[in-house]
């Protein structure tokens, strides 16, 4: 019953609730004080921890590792305990606070449950969402839709967030990403490029003007790009053009049928990106 309540509250949380809850902390504290890092224990999964360490060292954050197995016997196995020991040793070596819990159950459900008491979910992107109907069964999609926390995906090695590309379409979801972008620009000195593709030409100007005014309010200088192409360019291509090492965007928008037929920008980005993608719900 408790699990069902957590899942329900998380899935029905309003867009903007995460940002509103952290507006004060944004000016007085760090934005990411507790970070959830699910780990399979496989070699590539450790990239997520290394990215978490980059963030923790800048944010003075606590890292909460999570290794999920199917049975109690697996949880008590040497393999699971080795994952825990390695996680905590890497954190100690980096002078970062970090502990790992071994849990039993469904991976997606456990991640959503644990995310409630953290500020960010950081995951290694091994199997990005596919296309067509298969996209609806993607664990990443489920986490994005049902968790009230933003999700940072790591497809390859960790990056320092030196240059960020913000995909901004004026939606409430994109405003969440704008909030994080402004924070990184102010506190991390991240260089920012704002890219807008959706809408007619007049709307694009209005949309970018909103982002410009918001960033200028926070004394953030940025590059502003408006797409002149009829067909939207993949965000990873634009990120590469401007040498960005981070993409920020809102989560899925529009109806699911449209996303299946045409494809969601989030899913398309996750399939082709080689740099971390910060997705705001």
What are these regions (language model features)?
Residues 61, 96, 149, 190, ...:
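A short helix->loop->beta-strand "cap" motif at the edges of active sites that frequently abuts
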């Amino acid at each position: 019953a408790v699990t069902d309540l957590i899942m329900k509250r998380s899935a029905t949380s309003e867009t903007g609730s995460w940002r509103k809850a952290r507006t004060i902390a944004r000016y007085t504290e760090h934005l990411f004080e507790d970070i959830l890092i699910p780990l399979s224990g496989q070699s590539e999964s450790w990239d997520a921890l290394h990215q978490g360490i980059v963030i923790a060292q800048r944010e003075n954050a606590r890292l909460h590792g999570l290794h999920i197995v199917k049975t109690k016997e697996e949880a008590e196995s040497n393999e699971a305990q080795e994952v825990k020991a390695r996680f905590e040793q890497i954190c100690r070596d980096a002078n970062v606070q970090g502990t790992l819990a071994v849990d039993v159950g469904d991976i997606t459900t456990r991640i959503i449950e644990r995310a409630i008491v953290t500020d960010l979910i950081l995951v290694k992107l091994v199997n990005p969402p596919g296309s067509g109907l298969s996209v609806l069964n993607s664990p990443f999609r489920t986490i994005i839709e049902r968790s009230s926390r933003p999700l940072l995906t790591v497809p390859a090695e960790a990056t320092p967030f030196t240059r960020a590309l913000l995909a901004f379409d004026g939606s409430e979801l994109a405003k969440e990403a704008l909030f994080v972008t402004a924070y990184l620009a102010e506190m991390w000195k991240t260089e920012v490029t704002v890219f807008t593709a959706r809408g007619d030409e007049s709307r694009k100007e209005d949309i970018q003007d909103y982002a410009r005014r918001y960033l200028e309010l926070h004394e953030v200088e940025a590059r502003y790009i408006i797409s002149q192409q009829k067909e939207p360019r993949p965000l990873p291509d634009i990120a590469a053009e401007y040498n960005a090492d981070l993409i920020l965007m809102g989560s899925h928008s529009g109806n699911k049928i449209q996303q299946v037929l045409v494809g969601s920008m989030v899913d398309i980005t996750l399939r082709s990106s080689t740099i971390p993608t910060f997705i705001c719900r």
